[in-house]
Amino acid sequence: MEQNSIKGIPYGLSDYESLTRDNCYYVDKTHFIPLIEQEARYLFLIRPRRFGKTLLINMLAAYYDINNADHFKELFGERWIYEHPTALRAKFMILRFNFSAVNSTPGRLEESFEEHCTGRLVEFADKYEHLFQPGFRQELMSRTTASTRLDYINSTASRLRLRIYLIIDEYDNFTNTILSTFGKDEYRKATHGEGFFRYFFNVLKFLTSGNGMALERMFITGVSPITLDDVTSGFNIGTNITTSPLFNALVGFTETELRTMLELSLIHI
């Protein structure tokens, strides 16, 4: 058997594009893409850690990214979706946050949240600047908060008829740490009333209101529904697919998938 036909085991690897280019084994979940599109525009998925949530959203980002329009075969040629592409393939700019990077120490929390959001918004501007008018990045950075920068991106993209897919990984990482380490009072400061995290989700809802808004889709993952319940009472546009039978095998392995993996491994021993 030729060496390049043997798939590597991508232990700890959640970068879908690297996994594909390095010829690593991938349990194909791309047949869920049409179901995700049909389900709703703004989705929440709760699963335990180490279940493959990050790999899933990295796959979705690779599929929907407008910058990958010419790399479909390279990234998905071996997947189910290659023979069944949807109309939304490569139609979005991808805006991503991963809140595991936020410092949960109460004295640093809000500042760290702003820093993380700013970093991701700068990455977004660098990646898609060619789609906007000259001076877009400079105008974006003249705004002083994550909320005003999000609003500027959304309004500018809407005017240009561009589309945004927002992905948030580990949305509840720092809030779970606050609750378990610093207690309920500190947790409530961020997630209740005028708390900054609750306000962030209110802003997201606002950015989807109106006709022709660029922020068209969201996919948000986490490990617990606790924060979801606390910050999203005003964000009542999201659909929680966690317990939906349709998405039971969206992440993790089924018995059939695991058996197939083991059989291929035995063949190559």
Which residues fall in each region the model found?
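Walker A/P-loop-proximal flanking segment of P-loop NTPase domains
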Residues: M1-Y64, N68, K73-Y82
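Conserved P-loop NTPase "ATPase switch" module shared by AAA+ and STAND
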Residues: R161-A190
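Short regulatory helix/loop adjacent to the ATP-binding pocket of P-loop NTPases
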Residues: M213, I226-I241
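Conserved small/polar residues in nucleotide/adenosyl-binding loops
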Residues: I267-I269
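Substrate-engagement module of ASCE P-loop NTPases
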Residues: Y152-A157, Y187-L215
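P-loop NTPase motor core
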Residues: A69, K73-E123
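Short glycine-rich substrate-engagement loop in P-loop NTPases that contacts/grips substrate
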Residues: R137-Y152
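Structural recognition of the conserved hydrophobic beta-strand(s) that form the central parallel beta-sheet
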Residues: I167-D169, Y199, E216-V223
